[in-house]
């Protein structure tokens, strides 16, 4: 499992560090779960390092999930905790976004089945490039 921070967000952070954009523009605000970027026939990731701007196949009901953001030194930690529902859902991708929809993190991985009483928890640590 590996994730990418898209260039659009990296550029926004660089502009923020330079004092050109306000802090709220770079704060992660919500997450989406998806079921794309994985071929169940071959068991392979179809896009293990996504470079576009959204999850490939959003899962209905899992598209506006709250995240917890904390600053640790010069990094930002984004935590996501999603309780499973009554129906099992195979999750193969996660996207974290700012309030205006700019992708902060795009991640793809082999399927994780989410169903109550299980909870999906993940943490991403982002370091600014200066």
Language model feature labels by segment:
Residues 1-91, 99-130:
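Small cysteine-rich, disulfide-bonded extracellular modules of the LU/uPAR three-finger superfamily
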């Amino acid at each position: 499992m590996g994730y990418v921070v898209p260039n659009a967000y990296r550029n926004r952070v660089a502009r923020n560090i330079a004092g050109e954009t306000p802090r709220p523009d770079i704060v992660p605000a919500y997450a989406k779960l998806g079921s794309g970027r994985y071929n169940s026939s071959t068991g392979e990731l179809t896009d293990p390092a996504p470079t576009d701007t959204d999850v490939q196949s959003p899962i209905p009901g899992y598209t506006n999930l709250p995240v917890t953001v904390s600053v640790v030194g010069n990094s930002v930690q984004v935590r996501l905790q999603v309780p499973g529902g009554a129906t099992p859902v195979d999750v193969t991708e996660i996207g974290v976004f700012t309030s205006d929809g700019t992708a902060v993190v795009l991640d793809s991985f082999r399927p994780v089945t989410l169903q109550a009483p299980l909870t999906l928890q993940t943490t991403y640590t982002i370091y600014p490039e200066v």
